[in-house]
C-alpha cells in the first residue's frame, strides 16, 4: 500500500481549495441547470469538478476518476486506485445558501475506501480518515455514539420514510432532522452528533464513499439496509441503500429494514 498519508494530505488540500473556488463562483453569480432527473447543477459544480480533476489526476496520474459531474468511463475499472468525488454534495443547500453543503473526496483501492475527506467550508469542519487510523474532525479524534435504544436515537432522515404499511414492526418515536448533503449526514453520525442516517433507495458512490470510511473509522457501522457490505468502483457506481449508525443501533435498525426488498 502506497503512502496513504500523502493521499490524505492531497485530497484535504484539494477539497479546501475547491471550496474557495465554489465561493468565488457564487460571488460571480451562479448559473443553474436541471439534470434529466430534475436535480439542480450549477456553474460552481462544474468549475470545482474541473479543478479537482486537474489537481488530483496531475498529482496521481495512475489513479482512475469517478465524479458526479464528469461523464463516467469504463476505463476507471482498470485502475486499482481511483478518486471518487462529488464537487459539491448538497447542491440545493449551496444554492439556498444553507451551510450544509460539502466537498467529499475518497481514494478507493481494490473496491474499498482507504483515504477520505469531507470538507464543510461554511461550518469550518473538515472530517478525514485513512484506513486503520481512526477518524478526525479538525484534527481531533471523533467517535460514533454509544446510544443503544431506538427510543433514545436521533436520526438524519425523513420521518415520513419510517411510516406506512411496509413496516412490519412500527418504529418508536425518535428525533428527526434533515441535512441536504448525504456525505455530511454520515460525517455527523461519525462524530456522534446524530445516531444514524438511513436511506432505502440507491445512492451514488460519490455521495457515500468518503462518508463510509470516516464513519467506519469512527466506530459506526455502514451497510445496505439488509446488512450487506458495500463495494466501490463497480460498473454500476451505486449502492443499494444506506444504514449508517452507532454500533449498538445497527442490529435494531436491521430488524426493521430487513423486511424491505432491495430496490435494484
Map each language-model feature to its residues.
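N-terminal subdomain of lithium-sensitive/metallo-dependent phosphomonoesterases centered on the IMPase/IPPase/PAP
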Residues: 1-88, 249, 262-264
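Residue-level signal for inorganic ion chemistry
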Residues: 22, 45, 56, 91, ...
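Short coil/turn connectors at secondary-structure junctions
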Residues: 61, 79-80, 111-114, 150-152, ...
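Short loop/edge segments at beta-strand edges and connector loops
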Residues: 67-69, 139, 226
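DPxDG-like acidic metal-binding loop motif
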Residues: 76-136
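A structural micro-motif at secondary-structure boundaries
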Residues: 137-144
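An extended, acidic
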Residues: 144-264
